[in-house]
């Protein structure tokens, strides 16, 4: 080891004992490092003196170690700053930390090896180790530089991506803000619409309740109208049957009158013929008598005077008055039946015919549904105390309403402290007699049906009244019961009493 010629390379501008570490550091030329070498203007030459001062060599080694430590610290500091500013991938960070750790371990190994230099004999060997170590460190630093450049590029890309991400986040935040404001406006608008809808629903609910009440009322009215129509149909059915019977009787009477009229017409024709013949005979007799009278008068006048010749014809006289119509001629044969003519206008209504006989009493109809109980009226004032022994008042009281006088009108009966009418089913003159006698009249002159004196209001107390005619009160007559009826007020009965 001592015979190996190793020299440090220096330029001719440097001092002879200056260290090679004072040159600019070139990592690519470390492998060509020569120790204790002098340079001439023309060529290199080795020193013949194989001794390089031990003190200068140790100083140079110490300077190299210090420079290496400073370089390593600066590299580590730069890497820490680069790593602190970025969020590179964990694999590259691990590789970088591994390289730094390895570099630190090699530096510690170098320090330990330098501290354990035993003597001048081992100096050249240590220098060779240092040269190889520098070479290894140079390669590692070059790789570290490449990794640092890649890391910087990744940091730039990461920064650009971070800026793009920041812009995207800002745009997303603006979009979210717009969506939030729009959602708030939509929520407010939706709340207003829901409030208005709730109000409309409440109004519709109130209207539906009102309509339900109206429908129930209308249904009740329709039921009442149905009962009224049934009653009216029942009554009209009886009246129609009576009218049909009367019409049939009238048709028979008309046929009989037609036959009688034809017979009388034939008789009249014969009488007219006889009168015409007798008038002709009478005219002939009258002419003969006039001629006889003229002859007698002329005979009396011509007793002494002879008749001269006739004078000239006189002027034509005036037309005399028309004589009476002649006697109609004989009836000619009946001609062919002509075509049916156009129907003429409806004639005036004829007089009401006489009331027909009462028909048989019909069957009692089904009992109607019970009506709704009315509200209780206010309590009346307390009346005066009556006599202890008073006359018994009859339960039924009768009155005549809406007539031309107290002797006629619609019959109303007082029952249960309420006035009500009487239905005209089977209403006849006997019933009217009882009512008129109750009112102090001698009897009934005429009875009336179908609301002749107007339609009453309230209840219809009595129906199917059948009096014998000798009762003192109408409530003693037979009837269907108080308030039991299938009639309407169009069938209210009336009466006209004898005054």
UniProtKB/Swiss-Prot annotation:
Q: Name the SUPFAM superfamilies for this protein.
A: SRCR-like
List each copy of the SRCR domain by range.
398-498
Q: Which GO terms describe its molecular function?
A: ferritin receptor activity
Superkingdom field: Eukaryota
Positions on the Extracellular side per record topology: 85-499
Membrane side Cytoplasmic: residue ranges: 1-63
GO BP, one example?
A: iron ion transmembrane transport
Give the record's glycosylation annotations as residue positions: 99, 136, 186, 233, 256, 302, 402
Q: Where in the cell is it found?
A: Cell membrane
Q: Where is this region: Disordered?
A: 305-392
Transmembrane parts of this sequence? 64-84
Q: Which cysteines are joined by disulfide bonds?
A: 423-487, 436-497, 467-477
- Answer yes or no on keyword Oxidoreductase: no
Keywords from the named record: Cell membrane, Disulfide bond, Glycoprotein, Ion transport, Iron, Iron transport, Membrane, Receptor, Signal-anchor, Transmembrane, Transmembrane helix, Transport
Q: Taking every annotated instance into account, which residue ranges of this chain make up the domain Collagen-like?
A: 307-359
Any one Gene Ontology cellular component term annotated for this protein:
plasma membrane
Keyword Amino-acid biosynthesis set for record: no
Topology term for the membrane? Single-pass type II membrane protein
* UniProt cross-references to PROSITE patterns, sorted A to Z: SRCR_1, SRCR_2
InterPro entries in UniProt? Collagen (IPR008160), SCARA5 (IPR034726), SRCR (IPR001190), SRCR-like_dom_sf (IPR036772)
Q: Where in the sequence does UniProt note compositional bias of the Basic and acidic residues kind?
A: 357-392
- How does this chain assemble? Homotrimer.
* Family statement: Belongs to the SCARA5 family.
HAMAP family the UniProt entry points to:
SCARA5
Function according to Swiss-Prot or TrEMBL: Ferritin receptor that mediates non-transferrin-dependent delivery of iron. Mediates cellular uptake of ferritin-bound iron by stimulating ferritin endocytosis from the cell surface with consequent iron delivery within the cell. Delivery of iron to cells by ferritin is required for the development of specific cell types, suggesting the existence of cell type-specific mechanisms of iron traffic in organogenesis, which alternatively utilize transferrin or non-transferrin iron delivery pathways.
Q: What is this protein called?
A: Scavenger receptor class A member 5
Source organism per entry reads Danio rerio (Zebrafish)
């Amino acid at each position: 080891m001592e015979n190996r010629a190793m020299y440090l390379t220096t330029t001719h501008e440097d001092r002879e004992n200056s260290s090679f570490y004072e040159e600019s550091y070139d990592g690519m030329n470390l492998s060509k490092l020569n120790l204790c070498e002098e340079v001439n203007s023309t060529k290199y030459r080795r020193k013949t003196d194989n001794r390089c001062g031990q003190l200068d060599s140790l100083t140079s080694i110490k300077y190299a170690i210090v420079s290496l430590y400073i370089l390593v610290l600066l590299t580590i500091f730069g890497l820490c700053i680069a790593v602190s500013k970025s969020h590179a991938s964990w694999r590259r960070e691990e590789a970088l930390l591994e390289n730094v750790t390895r570099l630190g371990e090699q530096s510690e190994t170098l320090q330990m090896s330098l501290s354990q230099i035993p003597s001048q004999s081992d100096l050249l060997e240590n220098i060779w180790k240092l040269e190889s170590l520098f070479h290894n460190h140079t390669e590692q630093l070059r790789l570290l530089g490449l990794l640092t450049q890649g890391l910087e590029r990744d940091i730039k890309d990461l920064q650009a991506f971070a800026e793009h991400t920041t812009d995207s986040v800002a745009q997303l935040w603006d979009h979210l803000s717009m969506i939030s404001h729009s959602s708030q406006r939509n929520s407010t608008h939706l709340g207003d619409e829901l409030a208005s809808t709730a109000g409309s629903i409440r109004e519709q609910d109130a209207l539906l309740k009102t309509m339900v009440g109206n429908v129930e009322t209308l249904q009740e009215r329709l039921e009442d109208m149905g009962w009224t129509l049934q009653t009216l149909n029942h009554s009209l059915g009886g009246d129609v049957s009576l009218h049909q019977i009367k019409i049939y009787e009238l048709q028979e009477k008309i046929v009989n009158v037609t036959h009688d009229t034809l017979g009388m017409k034939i008789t009249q024709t014969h009488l007219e013929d006889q009168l015409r013949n007798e008038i002709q005979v009478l005219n002939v007799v009258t002419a003969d008598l006039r001629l006889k009278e003229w002859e007698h008068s002329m005979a009396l006048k011509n007793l002494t005077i002879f008749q001269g010749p006739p004078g000239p014809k006189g002027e034509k006289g005036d037309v005399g008055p028309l004589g009476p119509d002649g006697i109609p001629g004989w009836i000619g044969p009946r001609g062919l039946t002509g075509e049916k003519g156009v129907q003429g206008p409806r004639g005036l209504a004829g007089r009401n015919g006489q009331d027909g006989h009462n028909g048989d009493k019909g069957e009692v109809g089904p009992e109607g549904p019970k009506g709704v109980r009315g509200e209780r009226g206010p309590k009346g004032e307390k009346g005066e105390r009556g006599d202890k022994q008073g006359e018994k008042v009859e339960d039924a009281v009768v009155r005549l309403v809406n007539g031309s006088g107290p002797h006629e009108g619609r019959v109303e009966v007082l029952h249960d402290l309420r006035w009500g009418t009487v239905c005209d089913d089977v209403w006849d003159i006997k019933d009217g007699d009882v009512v008129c006698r109750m009112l102090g009249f001698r009897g009934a002159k005429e009875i009336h049906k179908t609301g002749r004196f107007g339609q009453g209001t309230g209840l219809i107390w009595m129906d199917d009244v059948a009096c014998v005619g000798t009762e003192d009160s109408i409530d003693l007559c037979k009837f269907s019961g108080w308030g039991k009826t299938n009639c309407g007020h169009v069938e209210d009965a009336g009466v006209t009493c004898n005054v």
